[in-house]
Amino acid sequence: MAVALNIADLAEHAIDAVPDRVALICGDEQLTYAQLEEKANRLAHHLIDQGVGKGDKVGLYCRNRIEIVIAMLGIIKAGAILINVNFRYVEGELKYLFDNSDMVALVHERQYADRVANVLPDTPNVKTILVVQDGSDKDYRRYGGVEFYSAIADSSPERDFAELQRERSADDIYILYTGGTTGFPKGVMWRHEDIYRVLFGGTDFATGEFIKDEYDLAKAAAANPPMIRYPIPPMIHGATQSATWMSIFSGQTTVLAPEFDADQVWRTISDRKVNLLFFTGDAMARPLLDALMKDNDYDLSSLFLLASTAALFSPSIKEKLLELLPNRVITDSIGSSETGFGGTSIVGAGQATTGGPRVTIDHRTVVLDEEGNEVKPGSGVRGIIAKKGNIPVGYYKDEKKTAETFKTINGVRYAIPGDYAMVEADGTVTMLGRGSVSINSGGEKIYPEEVEAALKGHPDVFDALVVGVPDPRYGQHVAAVVAPRPGSRPSLAELDGFVRSAIAGYKVPRSLWFVDEVKRSPAGKPDYRWAKEQTEARPADDVHAAHVSA
């Protein structure tokens, strides 16, 4: 008997509806829904046979490839909880994550074997290890690792998990570990039903209404040809997990690639006739734009939607993409691991605004003032984004942070991760940025994303982050850490004159550091700790003499 709104059930409804349809494509490999089911069932049975219990944690330490989706589905079919592992983590971070998540099993790519070998002695609960071949020759047998397909080959391909006491529920837990901008990663715990509703396609984004029946998406899949969807951020990011599960539940075809290569993205869109491209802000959009400006001979006639989420997407880049790709829809959405989808905007030519994204929020997202009241449209009051309704249970093993982020105000429980915004007169919301990285200069609160967007509009700036640095007069002033385009080195005076047309004078950077590359997460998230370290490690390359003391 199917249990409504469990992720495994929702996937199986689509598998039953379109078994022979291609579910996944990666390079020259592809898998139908029936093949995905068979391999995921084998993995689930193998994990159960290895002693992985209901609710146990299984790590996924892989780039985007077919095996990571097999593993995602197989882990959930086994009644376990998948743990996303950032493949850029060093050994100390891996040890923390393995330990904090109570991980008992791990699926990892072979290239990470040395790191895994060094971490396992300190994390003895990780006993079952499956290794995905990736062309590397690292030794994984020294710690008992077993090749992925060899391990599952003799396991049952049957869908008989209820008989194995792996009952499913809408209350089963799904965990997203956040990279965050400060501190160690935290595991955000969601009920399956809640994360399905706000992140995995259980709401009609056009109407804001819930999908009524658990079979509706599968029925629609059987009645319509598939869309070809291409999420390019790594699967460690909630945005790509969201795009992938939405594709699976609705019987679409998902294209994956282990590495982000802008030229290859456009070739893949052309070769695979991709319809929808998903990415995370400027860190991906700018290289994509540069590649397209260099070579615009790709056949992109199939592509009709470019969707960015969860990272700064600068107006200047939106405008140029619209110029090069006319008659496409470009969307810019807000959301987080703690809230799911929060709102979106559709960008048209000439409509890109300065500052943070201006979005239409969904009816479960509000902006609250300091007293916990909803901010009135056009009031000019800065408030904080809050989400009600289907929100997480809390952070795994962190009651203090749970109490700080998930609050009950006037009898309503909200998720409040710390993003500030203003409500415009027409009811749309302009995002200002995360409060934890805001800069206080002379009593004025400055949000980095607005300044970064202005800087990145300059033709000589490839990427930039801004942070606050000590100032004897103002307490802090805005400092820019800039990666210029090759052969360029814009002065602070040039940047000052350029950005003043987009932002107020008190927000303009007063000191400047040049770097070869701005450090970001694999999904393009800014690393403000790293940026702050750059300003502390050496003197600025340029300062505004009128505003910064020598």
UniProtKB/Swiss-Prot annotation:
Keywords: ATP-binding, Cholesterol metabolism, Fatty acid metabolism, Ligase, Lipid metabolism, Nucleotide-binding, Steroid metabolism, Sterol metabolism
Keyword Ligase: yes
Annotated region described as Disordered, given as residue ranges: 525-550
UniProt enzyme class: ligase
CDD domains hit by this protein: FACL_like_5 (cd05924)
GO biological process: cholesterol metabolic process; fatty acid biosynthetic process
Chemical reaction(s) catalysed: a medium-chain fatty acid + ATP + CoA = a medium-chain fatty acyl-CoA + AMP + diphosphate; a long-chain fatty acid + ATP + CoA = a long-chain fatty acyl-CoA + AMP + diphosphate; (25S)-3-oxocholest-4-en-26-oate + ATP + CoA = (25S)-3-oxocholest-4-en-26-oyl-CoA + AMP + diphosphate
Top-level taxon: Bacteria
Residues that, per the record, bind ATP: T178, G179, G180, T181, T182, G183, F184, P185, K186, D419, R434, K525
SUPFAM superfamilies noted in UniProt: Acetyl-CoA synthetase-like
A GO molecular-function descriptor: ATP binding
Pathway: Lipid metabolism; fatty acid biosynthesis; Steroid metabolism; cholesterol metabolism
E.C. no: 6.2.1.2, 6.2.1.3, 6.2.1.42
PANTHER family from the UniProt entry: LONG-CHAIN-FATTY-ACID--COA LIGASE, NONRIBOSOMAL PEPTIDE SYNTHASE PES1 (EUROFUNG)-RELATED
NCBIfam families: PRK07798.1 (NF005863)
Similarity remark: Belongs to the ATP-dependent AMP-binding enzyme family.
Known function: Catalyzes the activation of medium/long-chain fatty acids as acyl-coenzyme A (acyl-CoA), which are then transferred to the multifunctional polyketide synthase (PKS) type III for further chain extension. Catalyzes the ATP-dependent CoA thioesterification of the sterol 3-oxocholest-4-en-26-oate to yield 3-oxocholest-4-en-26-oyl-CoA.
This protein's name: Medium/long-chain-fatty-acid--CoA/3-oxocholest-4-en-26-oate--CoA ligase
Gene designation: fadD19
